[in-house]
Regions:
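Nucleotide-activated chemistry modules centered on ATP-dependent adenylation/adenylyltransferase
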Residues: 1-177
Length: 177
């Protein structure tokens, strides 16, 4: 399971564990900016890993330059690029490890483009010959929020890239005006 952050992973992990599905996590998020935010989210996943004794592989790569080069002048399509970048590597890793399938914690967030995530996951599954596990975890979003507070996990305020940070705070500022 691609883990975008500790908070979003909580409900999907609980749900899949309840179905007796073994989970191998993958931290791969070069889309998270700035570096201090990237580090806080990484440390939060590491904290969750210790508390819940999770099996997680880390691809610790801060990819600001690569991300910006890929999305410049295509900012409106950046989310699809971001999903593709992460789910492609997740599918490739799952196939290499001979796992039964792959999924992502992104499927829990009501703020993500759910249908696009599903489409990218299916495409990567076909490309790498490994099933993409689809489940709508969004009904557990608030459960995950409460659990993350109980566990004392860092709670981010925007999706990840500097564009989403700008949109979040710019919209908040506009709402005050």
């Amino acid at each position: 399971m691609h883990i975008c952050c500790a908070n979003c992973s909580l409900y999907p992990l609980q749900t899949l564990f309840a179905k007796n599905i073994d989970i191998k996590g993958l931290w791969l998020n070069p889309n998270i900016h700035p570096y201090t935010e990237y580090q806080m989210r990484l440390e939060s996943v590491q904290k969750l890993q210790k508390v819940w004794n999770l099996d997680i592989e880390y691809v610790d790569h801060y990819g600001l330059k690569e991300f910006l080069r890929a999305v410049v002048n295509k900012e409106d399509d950046r989310c699809v690029f971001c999903y593709t970048m992460r789910l492609e590597e997740t599918a490739r890793t799952a196939k290499k490890m001979k796992l039964d399938g792959f999924t992502t914690s992104l499927l829990v967030s009501p703020y993500q483009k759910f249908d696009k995530i599903i489409a990218v996951g299916q495409e990567m599954g076909k490309r790498y010959g490994i099933p993409f596990y689809e489940e709508d975890f969004r009904q557990g979003w608030k459960i995950g929020i409460n659990l993350s507070k109980d566990l004392g996990l860092y709670r981010q305020k925007y999706c990840g890239c500097i564009y989403s940070e700008m949109e979040r705070y710019l919209n908040k500022q506009r709402a005050k005006s």
